[in-house]
């Protein structure tokens, strides 16, 4: 059992180190093969001549007005539908 845990821990550490090393290689520019600093990319052009801009995703804030609770068969029987949604 100890050997099994040790092997799983080793595999997990290998996966984490590979993930960290590949995330460091990703940059916003084009890297040279000789490990020179990244050259920033120019924005791509759309056919009508306008520059393509990157839009950041917007998060929606949802306010919960009623407390959430678990559905019981009694709640469903009284209301006739599921009140949890």
Swiss-Prot record:
From the record, give the cysteines joined by S-S bonds. 71-84
Q: Where in the cell is it found?
A: Secreted
Q: Which UniProt keywords apply?
A: Disulfide bond, Secreted, Signal, Toxin
Signal peptide positions are 1-23
Q: Does the keyword Signal apply?
A: yes
Tissue expression notes: Highly expressed in the venom apparatus, and weakly expressed in residual body.
Q: What does this protein do?
A: Endoparasitoid venom toxin that exhibits insecticidal activity against Tenebrio molitor pupae. Impacts genes related to immune response, environmental information processing, metabolism, and response to external stimuli in T.molitor, suggesting its involvement in the intricate parasitoid wasp-host interaction.
The name under which this protein is listed is Insecticidal toxin Vn1
């Amino acid at each position: 059992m100890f050997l099994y845990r040790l092997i799983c821990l080793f595999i997990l550490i290998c996966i984490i180190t590979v993930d960290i090393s590949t995330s460091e290689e990703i940059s916003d520019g084009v890297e040279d093969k000789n490990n020179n600093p990244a050259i920033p990319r120019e924005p791509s052009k759309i056919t009508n001549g306008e520059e393509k801009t990157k839009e950041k995703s917007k998060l929606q804030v949802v306010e919960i007005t009623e407390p959430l609770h678990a559905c019981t068969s009694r709640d469903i029987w009284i209301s006739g539908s599921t009140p949890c949604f």
